[in-house]
UniProtKB/Swiss-Prot annotation:
The modification 4-aspartylphosphate is found at residue 54. This is Response regulator GacA. Keywords: Activator, DNA-binding, Phosphoprotein, Transcription, Transcription regulation, Two-component regulatory system. Residues 167-186 bind DNA. InterPro entries: CheY-like_superfamily (IPR011006), Sig_transdc_resp-reg_C-effctor (IPR016032), Sig_transdc_resp-reg_receiver (IPR001789), Tscrpt_reg_LuxR_C (IPR000792), WalR-like (IPR039420).
């Protein structure tokens, strides 16, 4: 029996995935988590074999949660399940140790296939994302996303800024001082050659970091 933990900040998504997997032979959803922080706690308590991890969540987010989870539980397999198809998200998650990366538009059969493959020690990447990653390797470096210049923490804070979260809110969620958050903000602006939150938001939309229709 493959033990699965579902991590997503949207209750409807977690419930939907859990219900879809309920009737699949050989799979058991042992729990749900609504944040990266809770996923670490649930992983310790429930000892899942596979974690279905959302990428964009409040708090530490799926990227950092994956890195921390695998540092403490290297035998767990993480499959990112997200709307983020554009790089640098797939590359970042795979570099962090995720064994799989698939979109939320995937069907039940694909999700079950991904879970079983990573449990068996293989990798799974949705075909459209695998194609993008393959094509990227043939592109000149100049065409790569400027967000590749940012660290994992900088990307996390950049997305929180784009999401209109105030410095104090970011400080509270990440357990950082406001001064440290402002330092990160300065570094982000410097690396991306921008000077305002509006420019950051536009750049994030242009490079697929956020959904323009959201």
């Amino acid at each position: 029996m493959i033990r699965v933990l579902v991590v997503d900040d949207h209750d409807l998504v977690r419930t939907g995935i859990t219900r879809m997997l309920a009737d699949i032979d050989g799979l058991q959803v042992v729990g749900q988590a609504d944040s990266g922080e809770e996923s670490l706690k649930k992983a310790r308590e429930l000892k899942p074999d596979v974690v279905l991890m959302d990428v964009k969540m409040p708090g530490i987010g799926g990227l950092e949660a994956t890195r921390k989870l695998l540092r403490s539980h290297p035998d767990i397999k993480v499959v990112a399940v997200t709307v983020c198809e554009e790089d640098p998200f797939p590359t970042r998650l795979l570099q962090a140790g995720a064994a799989g990366y698939m979109t939320k538009g995937a069907g039940l059969a694909e999700m079950v296939q991904a879970i079983r493959l990573v449990f068996a020690g293989q990798r799974y990447i949705s075909p459209q994302i695998a194609q993008q990653l393959a094509l990227k390797s043939f592109q000149p470096q100049v065409n790569n996303s400027p967000f590749d210049l940012l660290s994992e923490r900088e990307i996390q804070i950049a997305l929180m800024i784009v999401g209109c979260q105030k410095v104090q809110t970011i400080s509270d969620k990440l357990c950082l001082s406001p001064k440290t958050v402002n330092t990160y903000r300065y570094r982000i602006f410097e690396k991306l050659s921008i000077s305002s939150d509006v420019e950051l938001a536009l750049l994030a939309v242009r490079h697929g970091m956020v959904d323009a229709s959201a």
